[in-house]
Regions:
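C-terminal partner/receptor-binding element of secreted or periplasmic proteins
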Residues: 161-186
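N-terminal secretory/targeting leader peptides
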Residues: 79-80, 87-88, 130, 139-140, ...
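Mid-length scaffold segments of soluble, non-membrane domains
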Residues: 86-124
Length: 186
């Protein structure tokens, strides 16, 4: 009970801070004219933390996780992944997650570990079968026991589906051996 009350207070505080940062500010020198918002986006929160393993992104210097897809959208509605909006960006463990709606951003704030993809969004089969980092495609996914798993392509997904429990077991051992700053290289 205390934990859920704390989370509710935390979410409210983050939303209030984000709203205050994105609201137009008045400058007394401009006699009430509005100035640019402090925050670059309309909704932003930094949940802090450091990645415990590598997170897939298109370029090593990029911080956008899951190619900008809304990770909560996999679990809601039709279960179809939706592209997130820059307006609803949450930084989690050093990476930026985007959301299609404020409700989805709030859900992520409540429990980011529930929605963040397994193995940092890297291909679940590659990590399980070969202890290798390969890109995960946000359109090729499966939710197993409440966790989101991405795979490289549909062919690889088929191989992964042949022994999901076995590949997850191996990947759970292999993934932590990779450094958080590792990145897939072509």
């Amino acid at each position: 009970m205390k934990n859920s009350v704390f989370k509710s207070v935390l979410v409210s505080a983050l939303l209030a801070t984000a709203a205050a940062c994105s609201a137009p500010a008045t400058d007394s020198a401009d006699a009430g004219e509005t100035t640019e918002a402090v925050a670059a986006t309309g909704y932003y929160a930094d949940l802090g933390g450091e990645a415990t393993g590598p997170v897939y992104r298109k370029a090593k210097a990029d911080t956008l996780a899951v190619s900008g897809y809304d990770v909560v959208s996999y679990f809601t509605g039709e279960g179809v992944p939706a592209e997130g909006s820059e307006e609803f960006t949450i930084r989690y463990e050093g990476y930026d997650y985007r959301f299609a709606s404020e409700d989805n951003a709030k859900a992520f704030i409540e429990d980011p570990a529930k929605y963040a993809p397994a193995y940092g969004g890297y291909c679940a089969w590659a990590i399980g079968a070969n202890d290798a980092l390969a890109p995960g495609d946000p359109q090729v996914y499966e939710i197993v026991d409440g966790k989101l798993y991405l795979n490289f392509n549909e062919d690889v997904q088929g191989r992964w589906q042949a022994d999901i429990p076995g590949f997850i077991e191996k990947a759970d051992v292999n993934y932590p051996t990779h450094n958080a700053d590792e990145h897939y290289q072509d």
